[in-house]
A protein has these predicted regions:
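Long, charge-dense, low-complexity tracts
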Residues: 1-118
Length: 118
């Protein structure tokens, strides 16, 4: 069972929130990052005895949302000066690509867990 985040009018798993941002059905500016962090810390506390891989996947998604929002809040001059390494998310399109990549690895991970449990 996935942890349910409650943010503004949204309630559901973090990967659904990322999907809504990715498909422009939810505006990143409407997301209170402080709430995501608080919810994530609650999740970590409740899951600390369980699978660290699950906790780390939520951390990656939360970090991507935080990074995208911070980039969107930076003025255009600073955006041009920002580094352009492979981990940098400088636009909503970059976030969409990262989410698609995350979803691919999440499915692979789930398949590996199923194989391991057989």
């Amino acid at each position: 069972m996935e942890y349910q985040f409650s943010i503004n009018d949204f309630e559901g798993p973090l990967d659904l929130l990322l999907h809504l941002v990715k498909t422009s059905k939810m505006n990143i500016y409407d997301i209170n990052i402080k709430i995501i962090i608080e919810e994530y810390l609650k999740f970590i506390e409740s899951e600390k005895e369980k699978n660290i891989d699950i906790a780390s996947s939520y951390l990656v998604m939360a970090a991507e949302l935080i990074h995208l929002k911070s980039k969107m809040l930076v003025n255009d001059e600073e955006k041009e000066e920002a580094s352009d390494d492979e981990f940098s998310i400088t636009s909503e399109e970059d976030l969409k690509r990262k989410i698609i990549e995350y979803e691919k690895y999440k499915k692979i991970s789930e398949s590996l867990v199923e194989l391991e449990n057989k």
